[in-house]
Amino acid sequence: MIRTLAARLAAAALATAAALAQAQAPDRIVFATDWLAQAEHGGFYQALAEGIYRKHNLDVTIRMGGPQVNGLQLLAAGQIDVAMADGLQVLSAVEQGVPVVAIAATFQKNPTVLIAQPGTAKIEQLKGKPIAIASAANTTYWPWLRQQFGFSDEQKRPYGFSVQPFLADKTLSQQGFATSEPFSIEKAGVKPVVFLLADYGYPPYSEALVVRRDTLDKRRDALARFVLASAEGWKSYLANPAPGNALIRKDNPQMSDELLAFGHRKLREHGIVDSGDAKRDGLLTMTDARWRATVEFLKLTRLAKPDVDYPKAWSLQVVRGVKVLP
C-alpha cells in the first residue's frame, strides 16, 4: 500500500511538472517580413539577437520576404502568424474580404521619397518635370501627389528599379525609399535632394504588423508580448544596431555593412520609427485618427471602394497596452 501511495505521489508530481513545463513553454510565432533582411527590419532582428523575445516567453522565427513572397497570402493561408505589410496593402486586403487586421505599426513615417537632382529647393519645383515611378505608384502615392502638388500623368516615366537613368538625365527625378536608393546615388558621387512624402502629409503607415482575425481572438496575450518585445528590440536597435545587424547579415549575406549603417542612420535622421505619436504612446503605436486619415486619402483620390468596412483593417486592442518610449 505504501508503494502504491508512493507511486501515485510520484505520478502526480510528474503530472504537475509536465503541466508546469507546458504552461511555461514559449509561444511560437512565425513572422514574415516584407523584403530581404535589411536595416528596416532591424528592431525585430535585435529582439531575436538579444534574447528579448525569449525574455517574453516567445519562440520567434523571422522569415525573410522577397520579390516572389506575398506575406498577406501566406498569412491568409495560415502558413505564418504575423506578416509585415504596408497600410494600403492591409486596406486592399480588407477590400477583397481577406480576414486580416493590423495590430501595430513599425514606421510612424512612411519611408517613400521622391529623389530630385542637386539644387532642387522645394518639392513643388518638380511639377511638370519627368519623374520615374513604378506602376504600383498609381494606386498609392501618385494620386496623392497629383492632389497635393498638381502633378500630372504626363510627368510619369517608367521606373526600372535602377538609379542609372537618374544619374544620366539631369532633368529626371525618381521614386525611392529613404533608406535605400539615395545610398546608391551617393555612391555614384551625386548628392541628391530627398523629399520624404510623410513630411508633407502622406498618411499611410508602413511596416504594419498584421495577423488573421482568428489569431487576434485566440492568441491576444502572445501577440501583445510579441509587439512589446519588438518595441523593446527597436529601442535597442536604434541605440546600438550591432547585434541585430549581425543576424541581418546572416539571413542576407549580400547586405553590406555600409548600407546597413546608411539605413540605420536614415531611420534615425528622419524619425521613421520614433517620431510623431511614438514619442507619446511608444514605439510601434497606431492611432485610429491616422488610419481614418489614410482611408480619407483613398476616398479623396477615388481609390476607395464603396461599401467596404475599412475600420475592420486595424485594431488598437494590442498596441494600447504597449508603451515603450523611444
What is the predicted role of each segment?
Residues 1-10:
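Bacterial N-terminal signal peptides that target proteins for export
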Residues 24-168, 172-177, 195:
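Short, glycine-/small- and polar/acidic-enriched structural segments
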Residues 41, 45, 72, 76, ...:
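Extracytoplasmic/secreted envelope proteins and their assembly/folding machinery
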Residues 42, 108-114, 205-209, 213-214, ...:
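Small-molecule pocket liners
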Residues 88, 161-257:
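Pocket-lining segment of extracytoplasmic ligand-binding domains
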Residues 219-303:
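Secondary-structure end/capping motifs
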Residues 289-326:
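Conserved C-terminal helix/tail region of periplasmic/extracytoplasmic solute-binding proteins
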